[in-house]
Amino acid sequence: MASRGVNKVILVGNLGQDPEVRYMPNGNAVANITVATSESWKDQQGQQQERTEWHRVVLFGKLAEITGEYLRKGSQVYLEGKLQTRKWKDQSGQDRYSTEVVIDQSGSMQMLGSRNQGGQGAPMGGMPQNGGYQSAPQQAAPAQNQYAPAPQAAPAYQAPAPQPQSGYNQPPAQQSYGQQQAQPHVQPHAQPQQGGYAPKPAAPAYQAPAAPAQRPAPQPQQNFTPDLDDGWDDDIPF
């Protein structure tokens, strides 16, 4: 392909006059238009300069029909085709050569901008290849619709987010409940130890009655001895 070269032309400009459309014997349409492209620059003196180039463009087939129906003088268009030079004869019979931009089925044409009659030109964009131009906003519209459900999925994500938090709150509640159960076990165990320690001080009270310190028994003996002195000596046979 590189050895054969590339023949491709892209133009963005405005029509200099209304399209001329004619039909060939086989019924195919042919449209001739002239497109102006302008460029501006500043010269060495700083003055603004502008230059306009005129391009002859020939369209074939369906594109030619759409061009004649929707394009008018002043319409801004995007054209993509190839350069082609043809030979023809003038009225005097002399050969003439013309280099034109040919746009056939392999090329493309799109309308840019609009005029007062742009309402007619707008549908043109959607008829042939420009249908891709109108389909672009249609693709943008579903893109917005796809973005609208995205916020709706956030809340759904947010919705499950509190659920794991609530589940996390439940395990600590069980831990606190386990701690509360552990506390009652510790407290009753501490109480029996204190209860066991309480009877130990009661042991001295038990020693008080057990102690035979109360020996009143010798007292009757003392009372008994005076009785012996009083009368028991006489009764003793010895």
From Swiss-Prot:
Residues 227-238 have a biased composition (Acidic residues). Residues 125-160, 170-222 have a biased composition (Low complexity). It comes from Shewanella oneidensis (strain ATCC 700550 / JCM 31522 / CIP 106686 / LMG 19005 / NCIMB 14063 / MR-1). CDD domains: SSB_OBF (cd04496). This is Single-stranded DNA-binding protein. Keywords: DNA damage, DNA recombination, DNA repair, DNA replication, DNA-binding. Residues 54-60 bind DNA. Residues 105-115 have a biased composition (Polar residues). Plays an important role in DNA replication, recombination and repair. Binds to ssDNA and to an array of partner proteins to recruit them to their sites of action during DNA metabolism. Residues 6-110 form the SSB domain. Disulfide bonds: none annotated.
